[in-house]
Amino acid sequence: EKVMSDFISLNSILVNGKSYKVPIYQRNYSWSKDDWEDLWHDILEIPNDKTHYLGYMVLQPENASKDSYWIIDGQQRLTTLSILCLAVTSLIKKWSVEGIETEDNKIRFDKITERYLGNFSLSKLSIDPKLTLNRNNDDYYKSWLLKLRQPIVLSKLKPSQKLLQNAFDYYFEQLQNHFKLNKSGADLSEFLEKI
């Protein structure tokens, strides 16, 4: 199959109804705080009229219909951006529970989940995750992070799973701090859309 490589934005890759898979032979999630901080600062420096470039990604179609792609290069960045999207949904959900724009934020939560994190399956009547990680990380990603559940004991997690959780915690804290004086679901959604 033909391999594609291009410069793309988060919106162009995730808001297209396609799914992405990390091949089982790819390394575990390994980004750490330095990488998360670099990405966070890159995002904060995006001019208002521009979008963030994900950087270079290499994708290979999994099948002839091209509705699913293998991530040959760029899985660490795409995984991290997916975690950032999860942190956005978690903060919007928190605000909704706190009574901040409750109905609007419920809608935002559902739409962001559908748009960035999963494709709606008519047969299952549920969301199928857009991202499948490697065998060591996928179960944790789908069972804990996608469901916005916090592990009871972090010490029992594999090192790469701890990094996934720590990335989520890092971005949730950054978003809370960034929007603490302006708890606006509209502004938080706009922030996500420019990535």
Q: What would you call each of these model-derived segments?
A:
Residues E1-I195:
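Glycine- and hydrophobic-rich flexible loops that cap the catalytic core of alpha/beta enzyme folds
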